[in-house]
Each structure stands twice: as structure tokens, then as C-alpha cells.
Design a protein with these regions (language model features):
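Middle-to-C-terminal accessory/interaction subdomains
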Residues: 233-238, 242-277, 288-291, 300, ...
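Bacterial Sec-dependent N-terminal signal peptides
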Residues: 15-59, 64-68, 72, 77, ...
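Conserved ATP-binding subdomain of kinase catalytic cores across diverse folds
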Residues: 280-449
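Sec-dependent bacterial lipoprotein signal peptides
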Residues: 1-17
Length: 758
């Protein structure tokens, strides 16, 4: 912790910042480029004519920690780099040290009015506590941490939501001088002490350290919300204001366009499909801007689960913060990574149940606060909704929830709190040591491993080389049986079909993630589907409405005429050039080769049938959109839209997710028909598959959603049924007397297959 403090003090200044309200803040004079509503001078880099970038979210810069690392969407067959991997900035270090004699506090005088960050004149004044005067209190109870985290004592009142608050002069606890800042920076020996009664009238963050013999003790950080009404979880971020928001130096800012080593893609020629023009300093993606830096800053995070009704913060932690994304960095609201897995921040692991979809998961080394990527201008939940449809399948995805973010007390609107996709993701969700596997970023035939500490692409490179060069034709192919020890074929099949259903044009030569190796068969992760569900403007050469996804991935079944434009090349060049085409590089090639095998082809089709029957349905999309949007009350949407106006001519703002639901109306039938044509499938027949007793049945390796399951399959595609006993039970056979395990059956209408367990 001392190491962090020394570094931070070397860059931090102290001041008391003033601001007025949602439409005019302390950011006005410091960072007039970052953006607010049109009536404000706050962060005014974004003009009224703002457009979305053509590609996808979460691209990375250089790697240092355990994150997928890439500073560019390299060699991806799209018109411009996709927003598709996760940033892994390097942490800054300094050997600067502190030396200053202890100073005596100044004498107190009359109360001081502090107007730090934000007034809530436009917000309802429903608050959780009445006017309060506090002299000294302990830190609020911090829970859910690993053993090496020790809650800090605080001479400040507890952070939280107040109607008003008065702070009395602070009493040193160790015989030194308590010095404080109000701009998110760490206190230095030049920071002012609080020596007189102070009335907190607006949102304020205070950081204080007691200096003893010139050395700063632990810093305490408290965020106070005055007359705030927030009905969503709140994430309060405290970060050095200058380093984050200064118009010249701040990470969030465009700056003077001197960011080195990246180049300004905004000056590229060619078919870039630029759609976003919110920044008057440079065109999208403006790679020379500060927000493309891989720098990481220290940040303090406070979390209030129930918004302004939270009596005290649920947890707080020191971490690092960095800007993430690829083209979505150009958006006025940025995505950031919060990373705790660094010795400099003192805390290794946050133990808290962040996601209701998996409450038992309580170990996080990092998370993202996402601006909804390339869908920033269109909706709140598109990517999160699509990928969450994979819950219960063999495909992993990043869990998420919507939260409201404040920087140094300043309202920054709704963000998607999202699992971070790196090796720690596997440790969090599976309990597998993160260093024993590899998370691979797959861009065509280019592979990149997440993190350091032995991270390697070797296993996946060998897998790809093997699959792309092997003849898998025929039944009972030994080579196919061998590859199943290296590739989770159910995960791969379900993943590929789900992305086809999503109609994601920025895939499969981009936005592909898989983890495994070292004895773990590679499993795939649904990731960054921003360009799915009819997103426009989309990828050049990709028809957002009519593109046949089997042609896009595998190449046209017959020679076809494309629609021109290089785009993502579709299935090789054929998707966009009208030539006879082959499979797209990378996963498309793998799928094409594996489909040569009779067993895998049967598995792919039957897994797809189960997905279309239970997971990728109109009803499922409708209910998922409704449940997700229910977590974002209309009052919160209105406030976010006022803070970040969605006024781009190239996009249609869909705050309720209605367009997502409408797109799903006929999507299942459309992709099913494409599959029928690709594989010459015949009539659909309804089959019931049941388990009697303590056990379950797998259909071509895929678990069923219920023990008595009815699904439509194709009459000319066999089913492989495998009975799996559970909890000491024994499989005794099928109800028709058959005892095969597994069992191959030809489906006919009205059939029932019941496995008996005793």
C-alpha cells in the first residue's frame, strides 16, 4: 500500500473543486471536451452530431496483467479494427518518496461551504438519511474481502446518501496532521487540513491522510451524496481528477493528439465505414487521442448495492482503472476496466456476489464498467442480452448488471458492470487455477494469449493446425475422437450456431474467445456481439437483414453473387465478392472441417435444435429484454439520456429494447431455414425425451433443460441419447427394453424415449 501512496503523491495535487449541477460542473473549466447535455458546457468535446463506430467493444492495449491483450484489432478482416478485446494497461510506478516535517494544523474559524462536484437541483430529493453532524466515526463495516484486506479506520463520516452533512474539524489519531483533498487526488504534505466546520452541500469526495513525521499514513476515502435519488446500484469511483479528466493530460480526454506508438486511424483512407463524428478534434477512431493510452491510474471504488436507499456502502476497494475498448473509446462515455489483482493496490480479490444470475460466484480480481460498446447510440443491453441467452448451455459468457457510475461525485450515468474476460474469469467461474489454462483471443488465424505468467497460444495453435488439416470424413473416425480431448465439441458447436443466430457480422474472423489447454478441452465464450440483431450501420459487405450466416461462415454452398465491399470478407472473399467462396479463416475453417465428420454434423444439428427450442427463441428474448430493462427504471434512463444525449443521425435510439424484441420475432425460423438448406434436412418431428429416477439424458452430448423434454428434431438426422445416472443411481435401461448407452435412434413424430434410473 505504501508503494502505491508514494507513487500517487508524486502526481497528485490538492484543491477544492467547485461545481453547480448536472448541467454545469467542476469539469467545465478543466475538461470541456468530454460531453454532457446540450445546455451544458460540461465536457463538451462531443458535438450534437455523434455517431457510432462500425465495430465492436473491448479491445485491448498492451498486456501486463492477466487480461486479453491487444493494442489494435490487428489483421482482422473488417473495414476497421473491431472493438473486441480487453485492455491490459501497465501500472505506473515511481521511486519518488515523501519527506516533510509534521505540520501544525491551522486554527479553525467559521463554517466553510463546500460545493465540490455536483448539485442535484434537477433530481428528486428522496434521501436515506436526515441532516447529520459528525465529528469522528469509524469506517463503515467492509465485508466480503479476502483475509489480507483490513478495513481502514476513518476520521471522516461514513460515505453515503445524505440530505445535508456537516463535518467538524478532524482530530489526528497518531499525533500528526490530517490533510485532505477534494479532487480525487491523494493528499500530500501540501494539502490543506480541515480546521473549521464544513457544510457539505453537494456531492463530494474527500480523501484524507494523517501525516506523521512527514510520512502519510493510510488514506481514507469517503464519497458523500447530497439529495441524490438513485434507484440502481451505485459505483462511486475516486480518481485523480487531473490525470483522468484534464483536457490536455486526462485519460478520458482527446488531449493534444500526441499519443505515441499507435497512429491516427482517423486519417486512414479506404472503406472505413466511419459513423461517429462526435469529436471535433479528430475523426473516428482518433487513435492519437489520450483515451487510446494503455496507462492505468489508481482508483478507489465504493459500492452501494441499493442505490440511495443503501444505509452504508457494501464494499470498498483500492484498484487500478484504465480505458478499454477499441472503436467504442471514441464514444463520449468510455468503458473502463477496474483491476484489483495488483500488489500495488493492496487488495487481491473482491469477494462479493456481483451477479444475481450466479450468486454463488464471489471471487473477482477485476471487472469492467462498459458503455455498451458500439451499441452506445442504440440501446442499453444489446450485447448483454444476446450473450446471456447462453445461460444453461455449454457456452460461457460474461455476466452483467446495470449500475450508475459517479466519478469523484460527478454523475456519469448508466454503465454495464461486466465480468472481465481473462484467465481469472475461469478461476472465478470454475475454480481452476488461472495459471493452468490460457484464454485465447482468436482473430482469423492470429491467436493471442491473455496475460503473462506462462500464458501461451501453443495448445490452441496446435489444435487449429490439427483441425484445419485433418480429414474427419466418415463415421467412427479415430481422429475425430482424438480431437474431442482437446476441443469441447458441444461448446464449439453451440457457440458457432448461437453467433449465427445473433447474425453477428463482426464475426467469426473477429471477437472470438476460447479458454483451455494444459489438459482442458478448449471451451468457447460468447463475446462482443454488438453487431448482432440487425445492428446498423454495420460491417461493409454484410447484409444486416438478409445475410445467410451459413454462407458467411462456411462459404456459399453454391457460387453466389455478393454485394460488393470487402467488409469482413464474409466466407473468405466470396461473401463480399460474388465468387465461389470457402470457409472464413479461423473458427469458420474449424467448423467446415469438423462438419465433414458424420458424428459432429449430427451433433451440430441436434444441438442447434435444442438451442432453437429452448434458448434462442422469441419468447426467451422477450422475457430477457423485459427483465433486464426492469433493472433500469425510466427515471434513471431519462437522467442518463440527459447526461449523454443519443442524437446521432446514423442510429435509432431504442432505450426500451423494443427493436431487440422485434428482431427476434422471425429470427429462429430464418436461421432454421438456412440450416435446412445447408444440410438438406427433412421434416421436423416432435420427440419427447424423459428420465425416470435420479438421472439425466444427453442428446449428442448436450444436457436438456428439463427431465421431461419435448423438442422438434429433423426426421433424417439421428439422435444419440446418453443416459447419465446421478447421486448413486444406476441406469437400468430404456422403457422399451433397449439398454444401449449411448443409443442411436431415428426420430419419428410422437416418439417418447424414457431412460430408467434406480
Amino acid at each position: 500500500m505504501k508503494k502505491l501512496l508514494v507513487w500517487s503523491l508524486a502526481i497528485a495535487g490538492s484543491c477544492i473543486c467547485g461545481c453547480t449541477n448536472d448541467n454545469s460542473s467542476a469539469f467545465d473549466s478543466i475538461a470541456p471536451e468530454i460531453g454532457d447535455d446540450s445546455s451544458s458546457s460540461v465536457l463538451q468535446e462531443n458535438s450534437d452530431n455523434q455517431n457510432e463506430s462500425p465495430l465492436t467493444e473491448e479491445s485491448s492495449s498492451s498486456a501486463k496483467s492477466e487480461d486479453v491483450s491487444s493494442s489494435q484489432s490487428n489483421s482482422q478482416e473488417s473495414p476497421a479494427p473491431s472493438d473486441s478485446s480487453e485492455v491490459t494497461p501497465e501500472s505506473s510506478n515511481s521511486n519518488d518518496s515523501l519527506s516533510s516535517a509534521a505540520e501544525e494544523p491551522a486554527s479553525s474559524s467559521s463554517p466553510t461551504q463546500v460545493s465540490p462536484i455536483l448539485s442535484s437541483s434537477s433530481i428528486a430529493s428522496d434521501v436515506s438519511s436526515s441532516a447529520t453532524t459528525v465529528a469522528v466515526s469509524s469506517s463503515s463495516g467492509l465485508t466480503e474481502y479476502d483475509d489480507n484486506h483490513k478495513p481502514k479506520d476513518s476520521v471522516l463520516p461514513a460515505a453515503g446518501f445524505y440530505s445535508s452533512l456537516t463535518i467538524e474539524p478532524l482530530t489526528p489519531q497518531k499525533g500528526g496532521v490530517i490533510r485532505c483533498t477534494f479532487d480525487g487526488s491523494f493528499p500530500t504534505h501540501e494539502s490543506e487540513p480541515i480546521t473549521e466546520t464544513m457544510s457539505i452541500t453537494e456531492n463530494t469526495v474527500i480523501r484524507c491522510s494523517e501525516f506523521v513525521d512527514g510520512v502519510a499514513m493510510d488514506t481514507t476515502t469517503q464519497t458523500y451524496f447530497i439529495n441524490e435519488s438513485v434507484s440502481m446500484p451505485v459505483v462511486a469511483l475516486t480518481v485523480n481528477h487531473h490525470d483522468m479528466f484534464d483536457s490536455t493530460d486526462g485519460l478520458y480526454a482527446t488531449g493534444n493528439l500526441t499519443n505515441s506508438g499507435i497512429g491516427n486511424w482517423g486519417n486512414m483512407g479506404g472503406d472505413r465505414n466511419v459513423t461517429d463524428d462526435n469529436n471535433p478534434k479528430c475523426t473516428e477512431p482518433c487513435k492519437a487521442a489520450n483515451f487510446w493510452s494503455d496507462k492505468e491510474l489508481p482508483v478507489h471504488v465504493e459500492y452501494f448495492e441499493n442505490g440511495s436507499s443503501t444505509k452504508s456502502k457494501n464494499w470498498e476497494i483500492d484498484a487500478g482503472i484504465s480505458i478499454i475498448g477499441n472503436w467504442s473509446r471514441y464514444k463520449p462515455k468510455k468503458s473502463v476496466a477496474i483491476k484489483m489483482d495488483n500488489d500495488e493496490y493492496g487488495d487481491k480479490v473482491l469477494k462479493y456476489s456481483l451477479f444475481k444470475t450466479r450468486p454463488e460466484t464471489k471471487k473477482f480480481k477485476s471487472f469492467n464498467l462498459r458503455n455498451n460498446g458500439n451499441r452506445f447510440w442504440t440501446d442499453y443491453i444489446g450485447d448483454a442480452m444476446m450473450t446471456s441467452l447462453m445461460e444453461g448451455t455449454d457456452v460461457d459468457y460474461q455476466r452483467s448488471r446495470q449500475v450508475v457510475v459517479f466519478y469523484n461525485g460527478e454523475y456519469f450515468g448508466i454503465h454495464d458492470l461486466r465480468e472481465r474476460l481473462n484467465r481469472s474469469f475461469v478461476e472465478t467461474n470454475y475454480g481452476i487455477d488461472s495459471k493452468s489454462i490460457n484464454m485465447i483471443k482468436i482473430s482469423g488465424t492470429s491467436f493471442e494469449a491473455s496475460g503473462t505468467n506462462g500464458a501461451s497460444t501453443t495448445d490452441f495453435q496446435q489444435l487449429y493446425s490439427e483441425v484445419s488439416s485433418t480429414n474427419y470424413a466418415g463415421e467412427n473416425n479415430e481422429k475425430y475422437e482424438q480431437v474431442k480431448s482437446k476441443l469441447n465439441v458441444n461448446s464449439f458447436a453451440q457457440y458457432m450456431f448461437a453467433e449465427m443466430y445473433f447474425h453477428n457480422g463482426d464475426w467469426p474472423t473477429n471477437n472470438v474467445r476460447a479458454w483451455g489447454g494444459n489438459g482442458y478441452p478448449f471451451k468457447f465464450v460468447a463475446f462482443d456481439t454488438d453487431h448482432g440483431f440487425g445492428f446498423t450501420p454495420g460491417i461493409s459487405g454484410f447484409d444486416e437483414e438478409g445475410e445467410n450466416m451459413f454462407d458467411w461462415v462456411l462459404g456459399a454452398k453454391k457460387s453466389s453473387t455478393g454485394n460488393g465491399g470487402m467488409g469482413g470478407f464474409g466466407g473468405g472473399f466470396g461473401g463480399g465478392w460474388g465468387m465461389s467462396s470457402g470457409a472464413s479463416a479461423g473458427p469458420g475453417t474449424m467448423l467446415s472441417k469438423l462438419l465433414e465428420n458424420t458424428d459432429f454434423k449430427r451433433l451440430f444439428i441436434n444441438n442447434a435444435c435444442i438451442l432453437l427450442n429452448s434458448y434462442l427463441t422469441y419468447e426467451k428474448v422477450q422475457s430477457t429484454v423485459q427483465s433486464m430493462m426492469a433493472t433500469i427504471p425510466s427515471s434513471e434512463r431519462s437522467r442518463d439520456e440527459k447526461r449523454w444525449p443519443r442524437n446521432q443521425s446514423n442510429f435509432t435510439w431504442d432505450p426500451n429494447g423494443d427493436k431487440l424484441v422485434a428482431y427476434a420475432k422471425n429470427r429462429s425460423e430464418k436461421i432454421k431455414q438456412e440450416m435446412v438448406e445447408r444440410f438438406d434436412l427433412e421434416d421436423e418431428v416432435s420427440v419427447t425425451i424423459a428420465a425416470s429416477g435420479n438421472g439425466k439424458i444427453l442428446v449428442d452430448g448436450m444436457s436438456l433443460p428439463s427431465k421431461n423434454y419435448q423438442c422438434k428434431f429433423f426426421s433424417n438426422n439421428e439422435l444419440q441419447l446418453t443416459a447419465v445416472a446421478e447421486s448413486g443411481a444406476v441406469f437400468t435401461g430404456w422403457s422399451d427394453g433397449n439398454t444401449d448407452k449411448p443409443r442411436l435412434v431415428q426420430p419419428t413424430a410422437g416418439q417418447t424415449f424414457t431412460a430408467v434410473f434406480k
